[in-house]
Amino acid sequence: MEAVKEAVRKIKSLVIPHADEKDNGIVFEIKLNETDQRVEKWGLDPSLDFFEVTGNCNLGRPNSEGSNQSLMGSVTIRNIFNPKLDDLLSKIEYVRFLEAVKKPRNRTFKTSFFNSRKLSPVFTGGPGYEDLVPPMFVGRDCLKATITENLTRQRELTYGVMFEEIITRDENRRISENGLLLSPDGGISINGPPTTLSGTGIDHIATLQANITRDNTKLVNGAVVGEKNIFQVDQGLGIGNNFPLFNRHQLSLTSFIQLKQVEEGSDKPQPPVLVLHGRYGGCIGDLPSYDVFALGGPNSVRGYSMGELGAAKNILELGAEIRIPVKNTHVYAFAEHGNDLGSSKDVKGNPTGLYRKMGHGSSYGLGVKLGMVRAEYTVRHNRGTGALFLRFGERY
């Protein structure tokens, strides 16, 4: 019997579930370790659309032949029951450690080529207009190179350059130059906001990127305590269609405040924690609409769909959450607010105004953590209605 239990434990250690917060699903990875350091993974990701299942395959050679470099590749099919060529997502990544692990400023060089295709949160309708705005998809083919440095044990700096081809398409996979809007007679108006800087539906952009993270959080009986701050800058180089010169910057500050001292130990209860969060984002110059800040969504203002509150060049988000331990988990209450600071009208074509979005909104609610899942009842202040949501992972 003990042998069976040990075998089950070993199998569980090879099955790695984790949340896919971008596509609202769960990824189950199965890891196979071989003696020559090859890694192979495959998984299925059931999305919230129960008729669509994503399949993925990962191959790689970490620390190839002891040379401190690795090559990884992955292929993802958006729907394994109805595969299509333009739904095929791929990523190739090469990583090389530039310094020995024992050195205090360990540098890592990483270069990758990848593509993505996502629903744009900018070209969506506000309350009452959800069904009047056909979806718009943003596809990207990207080549990216970065260097990551550990400045200290708590500070990490990443900087690099990225080249992108961006194509916007409608739900019929046709290249679309403008956002769409259904007219009362059932027809489609194509005189919406422009989807790209070039006005053709296709952009080519080169960007310098840098971000610095300060993270001094720690675990106290399983509860996160401390601070995590992130500052990120994206600088357009003027290379590409219409010579795009822009600066996009954002600062995120999150504090996890321990409200009560507790004895630390594996079987000891978690302390109550107050989480305070703030995020500011700003843009200067010719930023394309697909890269402006979208207000609303599980990682912006909970209770609203992604982009439901607006798309803006400048935003401010504030949030607070108090976590109270209950046995092996915790319950929590939260409140959040997002505001476009009056900058929605500065986005080309003003999609926030055209699609009847508010430009600001608040929410509050209660939740309980159930393993990896958060069950939340959220009240959307703008609508005066509430709903139950299931989310994966942590909000902060």
From Swiss-Prot:
GO terms for biological process: etioplast organization; protein targeting to chloroplast; protein transport. InterPro entries: Bac_surfAg_D15, D15-like. Residues 33-87, 149-156, 281-292, 371-384 are cytoplasmic. GO terms for cellular component: chloroplast outer membrane. Expressed ubiquitously at low levels. Transmembrane regions consist mainly of membrane-spanning sided beta-sheets, which are not predicted by sequence analysis tools. Mediates the insertion of proteins targeted to the outer membrane of chloroplasts. Required for the import of protein precursors into chloroplasts. Forms the voltage-dependent preprotein translocation channels (hydrophilic beta barrel) of the TOC complex in the chloroplastic outer membrane. Required for etioplast formation and/or etioplast-chloroplast transition during deetiolation. The gene is TOC75-4. PANTHER family: BACTERIAL SURFACE ANTIGEN (D15) DOMAIN-CONTAINING PROTEIN, SORTING AND ASSEMBLY MACHINERY SAMM50 PROTEIN FAMILY MEMBER. It is found in: Plastid, Chloroplast outer membrane. It comes from Arabidopsis thaliana (Mouse-ear cress). Part of the TOC core complex that includes a protein for the specific recognition of transit peptides surrounded by a ring composed of four proteins forming translocation channels, and four to five GTP-binding proteins providing energy. This core complex can interact with components of the TIC complex to form a larger import complex. Chloroplastic protein precursors also interacts with these complexes. It is a multi-pass membrane protein. Keywords: Chloroplast, Membrane, Plastid, Plastid outer membrane, Protein transport, Transmembrane, Transmembrane beta strand, Transport. Residues 1-23, 97-140, 165-271, 302-363, 393-396 are chloroplast intermembrane. The chain crosses the membrane at residues 24-32, 88-96, 141-148, 157-164, 272-280, 293-301, 364-370, 385-392. Its main location: plastid. Belongs to the TOC75 family. This is Protein TOC75-4, chloroplastic.
